[in-house]
Design a protein with these regions (language model features):
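Conserved catalytic or regulatory cores that recognize and/or transform ribose-phosphate-containing ligands
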Residues: 1-106
Length: 106
């Protein structure tokens, strides 16, 4: 079975611990069989917010699915990514729900 690519979406701006949060989710998703595209790997400075969103959008577009971290609604960028995924009819899921099912053995 071919692994699915998944884009990780959540709050980055204003969260000093975003890298740890994203890396932990990436680790768990990879253990679950996904190939994870993690926008937290982008440089933390040097670009305008809109430039980051264009880069993240390109990453999202290339993935089969999108996974939303619990704080995604607190992020203007992640809300925009949700809208983009919805408009593309791209499958998406919520990390908390996925993790709960995984922990329950489903």
């Amino acid at each position: 079975m071919q692994k699915k690519t998944v884009y990780l979406a959540g709050k980055i701006t204003g969260d000093p611990f975003y890298r740890a949060k994203f890396y932990e989710a990436q680790r768990k998703l990879e253990e679950g069989g996904f190939i994870v595209v993690n926008p937290a790997l982008l440089p933390s400075e040097g670009f305008a917010w809109e430039a980051y969103m264009r880069m993240a959008g390109a990453m999202l577009n290339e993935c089969a699915e999108v996974c939303f971290l619990p704080d995604w609604k607190e992020s203007k960028g992640a809300q925009r990514e949700f809208d983009e995924a919805f408009m593309q009819e791209k499958p998406f899921f919520f990390f908390e729900e996925w993790e709960a099912k995984r922990n329950a053995g489903e």
